[in-house]
Amino acid sequence: MKYKIPLFINLALFPILAVMIGCKVGDSKVFKPNVVIIFIDDMGYGDISCFGDETIETPNIDALASNGIKFTNFYVNSPICSPSRVALNTGTYPMRHRIHSYIASSKKNKNRVMANYLDPTVNTIASTLRDNGYATGHFGKWHMGGGRDLGNVPLPTEYGFEKSFVSFEGVGDRLLFLNDNLSNQSSKLGRGKIVWAEKYESTRIYIDSALAFIDRKGDKPFFVNLCPNDVHDPHLPDSKVLEEFVSLTNNPWEQKFFAVLRDLDNQIGRLIDSLNKRGLLDNTIIIFTSDNGPTDWGKYYNIDNYPKAYEGELYPPGFTGGFFGRKWSLYEGGIRMPFIMRWDSKIPKSSMDSTSIVTAMDLFPSICSLIGIEYPKNLDGIDKSKSFLGVPIVNKFPVMWEYSSNPGGSIKPGGSWNIGGSLKPKNRSFHSPNLAIRNGDWKLLINTDLTGEMLYNLNNDPGEKINLADTEQEIVKELKDKVIEWRKSMPVEIPKNIQ
């Protein structure tokens, strides 16, 4: 005989059954996706094989792209670390926080009218996600306050991160490098547990720390900022990895760079495998990009530092994919970065977007939109979430940059605004004006004193070889007016003698 269970009993049992199978009725937090941002240090647009590097392969990073979407018009909001990281974490132009170059010693910061640290009262992506039920952790380079002589600064936990493990340019629990001057300075600041290691071990240690954090999060979704110190110079690879590249190139600096890049790729692969083994990969948004272009630092790459027996072209390692300029430059090579997003349950595999212009400060509102939470309305960043799901967006608003104002400095006749106290590329041709604006296909570079106009059509001339400023004066005026108006709205005033 078959017995029928009355409908009211079925309905009464439903909540119990839901709990038994692991679902929480009315609790949407269970279904919130996890978020991992991998923010590499000093990686150029063309450093990974899925963005054109033909010298070595980066199979694990490439796998992110083949399982997700890559963007060819992604920009960071500065060609140097501190302001680039401020934009990513706050969704705003870094100049709003008086951070327009790298945070250094208190004396250098004062000379450049720079803040010593990011104001901890500002909204960050970490604080927003934390307030919406996420476990939040930062692992790796910080550089938004702390290090050198700056010990009395806010901890990363004051910006919304429940757990942090940083490097020498931060305070709190941190990893310091053996035989490193900045690490030695940091060790004297106190304020946290210190772990010492070789630099080549750092990415592995950061990932181990992030995975341990993920394992302790309970039933919360997680947000992880993973910020390796790789591939920033000096390149100090594991000797065993270096052996693989000795025969690949006779440039000793490239050998070391390739070894560091290979180890970074292996560690990214280990992270992805670990997420997969934990059953987390399908519902985790993974973002991969870099903070600025590849280095061109004279202190490392000059003729005196080459081995006497070396014969060949003198150039630093790192590739811009054909774009002009490098780190510390507002030309494309300094600010256009490789960008990949993977979300297995939502993003079509092997997608590419060459239409949408997306910046690092757009990630804050876009991520919030993707995971279904509200974001602050006072952000400069724009919600570009549709583009990440395969629907290209035509930009309606321009994007603007400033690198390293020095309001106390002077104007050099015929040259760029003096940016004393900040760094410039060794190659003088990469020294750009200190302001830039992109609107559609057009990009204007100009100094704050209105000298050095350079106008490029990036659709026709992505390498910025043909300056059209003399023949397109109407476009120059339109973009110049916009970028100067924007610059005047920032808290650091332009000196009256150059307005």
Predicted regions and their residues:
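Formylglycine-dependent sulfatase
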Residues: 2-4, 10-12, 21-454, 458, ...
